Structure formats: C-alpha cells, structure tokens
Amino acid sequence: MLPFEFEFNTTSSPECDVCLDPQKLFVKLFKRTIVLLSGPTGSGKTDVSLALAPMIDGEIVSVDSMQVYQGMDIGTAKVSLKARQEIPHHLIDIRHVQEPFNVVDFYYEAIQACQNILSRNKVPILVGGSGFYFHAFLSGPPKGPAADPQIREQLEAIAEEHGVSALYEDLLLKDPEYAQTITKNDKNKIIRGLEIIQLTGKKVSDHEWDIVPKASREYCCRAWFLSPETEFLKNNIQMRCEAMLQEGLLEEVRGLLNQGIRENPSAFKAIGYREWIEFLDNGEKLEEYEETKRKFVSNSWHYTKKQKTWFKRYSIFRELPTLGLSSDAIAQKIAKDYLLYS
C-alpha cells in the first residue's frame, strides 16, 4: 500500500505504465534505481555495459571474484585501461594476488561503491557473471558458523587420500544447489560447504543471511541476464580462449606465479589460470599444449552452464535473448527500461 492516496489517470498512453501502476509510482518516488547486468561467460556483458553507461550516465561496478586482483587481466577478460579511463569502473584491481577476497568483502565494497556513485547523481551498473556475488548483493552477506579445525582436518585428509572430486561428489549429494554454483576443483569452497552442513545440519543454499541493509530493499534493482543462442556462445568461448592465448595469457600466468598466486587458493584455481599453471608445472611440453587448451575451453563452457543454472533461480533477472542484436541495441533496450523506472 502507498502511504498516501492518488487518483490515477487510467487514460494515459500505453507507454506511461508508471502512471497506471501504484507500485511503479512508489518505486519512482522513493527508491533510487540501479541496473544489474549478468549473463554467461562470453555473452558480451562488457560491450553492452560500455554502450549502456553513457546512455544513462552510469558507472560500472564489477561483480567478478577475480577481476579484483591486480595482474589477472587477460584470463579474466578485464576491461581495458582505456575504457576504464573513459567510464569509471569500481572493484577492479583492488587486491594484490596474494590477498584473500571473499563474498563478504565483495558485499561491503559493492554497497560502498553504489553509495558513492549515487551520491554524485550517477547510476550504478553492476556487471558480472557471479551468481553467488549477485545473491550476496541483493540479500546481504552470508552468515555461517566459525571454522572448525577438526572437521577441516578430516575433510583435508579425505581430499589428500581420495582427491577433491570425492568431496565434491559428497557435496553434490548433500547440497546440489550450492554444488552447482562452484567448480569441482575449488577445494576451499567445497570444504567450507561440507563444514557448514556438518556443523549446522542445514544446506548452504538454505542458510540464513545476515540481517543488514539489503540492496533489494534499498534500491529498485532492474536486473537483466543476457541469453545468447547456444551455438553462438560455444563458438564465442572457443574464440575467446584462443584470443586470450594470442594476447599473452601464458606470460601473464608466469608473472602471477612470480607474484605468489599459489598463496591464494581461489585465484590459483580460477579457470584460465589453473589449466596453464599445471601446464607450466609439467615442463611446458609441446605435446600437452593442445590438450591443455582443450581443457581450458571445456572448463569455460561448463562454467557457462553453471551460470545459467544459478540465474534461473532468480526471477528478478529477466532473460534477454541477444540473437541478432548488437551491443548498442541491447543497451538501448536496458536504457529504455531504466528510464521508465528512474
């Protein structure tokens, strides 16, 4: 219910549906509107965001767990420095590769960035492919029990004896929803998930979240999920991986090893890095190059399927088919929607 009464003009033109909908009018008067843009890896999120920002006077907030790290540029498809100079970007290059960065850190950094952008009468545009991070932004940071050294030691022993895949299979049985959102090689997240289940008797996906100001309450969130045609996306992933190698991904990985990426399990296991770290560790054998590249492409493709699964859970994200549309055309659709609510 609105806290006041209005007489609504029901003869307004179809374009002005804000005039006909009390909820939309309430949002328009009392909430600031922000834009959330996601989509699978290789769907063109970056190009769309760069086209969209000037249309709505926006600044971009990265929703990516690896783009926060300095030096992880090519493998994360980080937006160019030139583009960042033209359009302000937030949450990029804010950590050294050895420093930890988790979903709680992201939540508070992202909220702070949005407040800063809005204080200057600009529009926050959150862009990325991490469903877990978007969920934290909308719902608040996760609240879980403290780590239990004994349980962790037991789980580490299982991983040592039977491999991380055994732990992942266990997590898949106990909490398939959460397991689908992480990679089967991410030992830290797998162990943390099993630890929470063992300590609380509840699935991670069912766990309570901290009672803090939530973006979904504070702002009117207009959220979009880019949905390219499957064959197009597959081809794009292949070309993207090839381009990264041509741009110097292997040299980037060598540099990160020198900077201590092994000290950061999350960064060390990131797709596009773990495959080539293994290749370098095995002596850079020429006969293993093509197989490593195949794994790189395959892992990237499988991750896109996890992303789609995650975002299907959230009705706030509206699917936007992109077949036959340029980045500008997609941006115009989103800008038109934003202007209706702002």
Swiss-Prot record:
<protein>
    <recommendedName>
        <fullName>tRNA dimethylallyltransferase</fullName>
        <ecNumber>2.5.1.75</ecNumber>
    </recommendedName>
</protein>
<feature type="region of interest" description="Interaction with substrate tRNA">
    <location>
        <begin position="64"/>
        <end position="67"/>
    </location>
</feature>
<keyword id="KW-0067">ATP-binding</keyword>
<dbReference type="Pfam" id="PF01715">
    <property type="entry name" value="IPPT"/>
</dbReference>
<keyword id="KW-0819">tRNA processing</keyword>
<comment type="function">
    <text>Catalyzes the transfer of a dimethylallyl group onto the adenine at position 37 in tRNAs that read codons beginning with uridine, leading to the formation of N6-(dimethylallyl)adenosine (i(6)A).</text>
</comment>
<dbReference type="InterPro" id="IPR039657">
    <property type="entry name" value="Dimethylallyltransferase"/>
</dbReference>
<feature type="binding site">
    <location>
        <begin position="39"/>
        <end position="46"/>
    </location>
    <ligand>
        <name>ATP</name>
    </ligand>
</feature>
<dbReference type="GO" id="GO:0052381">
    <property type="term" value="F:tRNA dimethylallyltransferase activity"/>
</dbReference>
<dbReference type="InterPro" id="IPR018022">
    <property type="entry name" value="IPT"/>
</dbReference>
<keyword id="KW-0547">Nucleotide-binding</keyword>
<dbReference type="InterPro" id="IPR027417">
    <property type="entry name" value="P-loop_NTPase"/>
</dbReference>
<comment type="similarity">
    <text>Belongs to the IPP transferase family.</text>
</comment>
<feature type="site" description="Interaction with substrate tRNA">
    <location>
        <position position="152"/>
    </location>
</feature>
<dbReference type="GO" id="GO:0005524">
    <property type="term" value="F:ATP binding"/>
</dbReference>
<dbReference type="GO" id="GO:0006400">
    <property type="term" value="P:tRNA modification"/>
</dbReference>
<keyword id="KW-0460">Magnesium</keyword>
<feature type="site" description="Interaction with substrate tRNA">
    <location>
        <position position="130"/>
    </location>
</feature>
<keyword id="KW-0808">Transferase</keyword>
<comment type="subunit">
    <text>Monomer.</text>
</comment>
<feature type="binding site">
    <location>
        <begin position="41"/>
        <end position="46"/>
    </location>
    <ligand>
        <name>substrate</name>
    </ligand>
</feature>
